[in-house]
Regions:
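Glycine-rich Rossmann-fold phosphate-binding loop(s) that bind the pyrophosphate
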Residues: 8-9
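N-terminal Rossmann-fold NAD(P) dinucleotide-binding loop
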Residues: 12-13
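Aromatic pocket-lining residues of Rossmann-like dinucleotide-binding sites
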Residues: 19
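Rossmann-like NAD(P)-binding element
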Residues: 31-35, 49-111, 119, 351-383
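Amphipathic alpha-helical segments at domain termini/boundaries
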Residues: 64-82, 164-173, 179-181, 427-436
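Rossmann-fold NAD(P)-binding glycine/threonine-rich loop
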Residues: 97-146, 153-166, 369-422
Length: 546
């Protein structure tokens, strides 16, 4: 295939390297001839580096470079060109002008593809005399390493173009996902779940950026925390994408931006590229703050509470309701069980017992015990109020299994600092021969940090599936390949279970009153029907044909 790439910047040269290495003849052009020269030199250096590392033979390198043809004139006649990939700046008028000139220079058989990441494919195509010949082909940077491409048909795109582009992408060693022409397409849309919820947690002073990032990495298993990621991408870029997608989906609460970003962008706090973002960078930047050491009495007795969370409220029975918050003692017996936190309570008791902690049994804590409440979409404060627990020494624990050795302790405004330090020391205990746990301390919030981040990631992905913007399998494939998540968001929800995820979403919605946490129809139906979130389900069309 003969492919013309218009635009020799970072994306254009990456696409050129990818296509030429896969055996295609590539015409690389730009209105700036010096950019083409620099791009060819860059591709040559990348291919030679691959030879040095044993990833490519010298013969294959030479053949790929022979297939890379620099053009002085982007609008040159090209009767043999099969495909054009446009990779110029993100501006609708600029792209329309490029395709208008190409339409005059190239045969009608040539397929046009835009690498836009944020503009409507349909609006770009509308500038053409023949809008049916254009589709989106969205690569990610660096192209040779990011092995996922979004294929985006516009409203008028000919039906045979999408499978043809998909075949091209996959024959060149990348994976292709078909995505509807909607704001953010798939990967950028799905990625809003993590960063918008992280910003919401920061707005509420639940934890600082470093604390949220630690939990995202160690509990959820992400490679980077959301604030590290924003600093790497650039907050100016991230904030613009958040705003664009939110506006494009007509101010959908699930995608709501934060008030924190505009002033930081205006102040130049963009991240790595400016030397200062959520964190400081550069040779003179102060070292990152070290997590506070665990202190306190690790031998203090602990009482683990079973709380029911099926409907987002506690079902624990309280016999006697008087609570002495001054002395931190409770006269109420605590009992009860539930589907969400109860299993977490059992697991926590077993783990602490195995670590040698003094875990109390019975219906109520002793006057000296710290009280741990596994929360699932609810708050510690609600458990204190409904179960008559001692407010000064009752703390929340996230029952989500952690990817690494970290536990999370939630403290209320009524918590005693000494009791909190003791609770942290108890949670840090590990069985003989194992490393102690790191223990994050966060402000009491509905569901704690990791639950809210996970719920948002799953919810945004479920809303994409619900709108039929992409198939469940493509959603999970694109997110793992494009965002580096350890598992696709829908499969992640299935690991927890659709019913339990619905319980979490309902509890978050009921506790906060924030519509961003409302459950999707996709999640609700699958929980009710016993289907996994990754199941596309039966369509009406399937019931009328065959």
């Amino acid at each position: 295939m003969r492919i013309r790439i218009v635009g020799a910047g970072a994306m254009g040269r990456g696409i050129a390297q990818w296509a030429a290495s896969a055996g295609h003849t590539v015409e690389l052009c730009d209105v700036r001839t010096e950019a083409v020269t620099a791009a060819v030199d860059f591709v040559r250096s990348m291919l030679e580096r691959a030879v040095d590392k044993g990833r490519m033979s010298a013969g294959d390198c030479a053949a790929a470079l022979e297939r890379l043809v620099p053009l002085d004139d982007p609008w040159a006649q090209g009767p043999d060109v099969d495909l054009v990939i446009e990779a110029v700046r993100e501006d609708l008028d600029t792209k329309a002008e490029v395709f208008g000139k190409l339409e005059q220079a190239l045969p009608g058989s040539a397929v046009f593809a835009t690498n836009t990441s944020s503009l409507s494919v349909t609006r770009i195509a509308a500038s053409l005399k023949d809008p049916t010949r254009l589709a989106g082909l969205h690569f990610f940077n660096p192209v040779p390493l990011m092995k996922i491409v979004e294929v985006v048909p516009g409203a008028a795109t000919r039906p045979e173009i999408v499978p043809a582009l998909t075949e091209l992408v996959e024959s060149c060693g990348h994976r292709a996902v078909t995505v509807a022409d909607t704001p953010g397409f798939l990967v950028n849309h799905a990625g809003r779940g993590l960063v918008t919820e992280a910003l919401a947690l920061l707005e509420e002073s639940v934890a600082d950026p470093a604390g949220i990032d630690r939990i995202a990495r160690d509990v959820l298993g992400l490679r980077m925390g959301p604030f590290e990621l924003m600093d790497l991408t650039g907050l100016d870029v991230t904030a613009a994408v958040i705003d664009s997608i939110w506006q494009g989906f007509r101010y959908e609460d699930r995608l709501r931006p934060s008030y924190l970003t505009p002033n930081r962008v205006a102040a130049g706090l963009h991240g790595r590229k400016t030397g200062q973002g959520w964190f400081a960078y550069g040779s003179e930047a102060p070292a990152p703050a070290v997590e506070a050491p665990v202190t306190g009495d690790a031998d203090r007795p602990v009482f683990v509470v079973d709380t029911g969370t099926t409907s987002g409220t506690s079902t624990g029975a309280v016999s006697g309701t008087s609570t002495d918050t001054t002395s931190g003692t409770s006269t109420g017996a605590v009992t009860g069980a539930g589907t969400g936190a109860a299993s977490g309570a059992d697991a926590l008791r077993a783990a602490l017992t195995a670590a040698g902690a003094t875990v109390e049994s019975g219906s109520a804590p002793s006057a000296d015990a710290v009280v741990l409440v596994p929360v699932w979409g609810t708050t510690v404060a609600a458990a204190v109020a409904s179960l008559g627990l001692p407010a000064g020494r009752t703390f929340g624990v996230d029952p989500l299994p952690a990817a690494r050795r970290r536990r999370v302790l939630a403290v209320t405004p009524a918590a005693g600092p000494d009791a909190a330090r003791d609770a942290r020391a108890v949670l840090a205990r590990a069985a003989d021969g194992e490393e102690p746990y790191a223990v994050s301390v966060v402000r009491d919030t509905a569901g704690s940090v990791a639950q809210r981040l996970l719920a948002s990631v799953v919810s945004v992905a479920a809303s994409i599936a619900e709108r039929s913007l992409a198939t469940p399998s493509d959603i999970d494939l694109a997110v793992t390949a494009g965002l580096g998540y350890p598992v696709g968001p829908l499969a992640w929800g299935d690991r927890i279970g659709a019913a339990r995820m619905l319980e979490l979403q309902r509890a978050l919605h009921a506790t906060t009153g924030d519509p961003r946490h409302r459950p999707t129809r996709w999640l609700t139906e699958r929980a009710q029907l016993g289907l996994p979130l990754t199941d596309p389900g039966t369509s009406p069309a399937a019931c009328t044909t065959g």
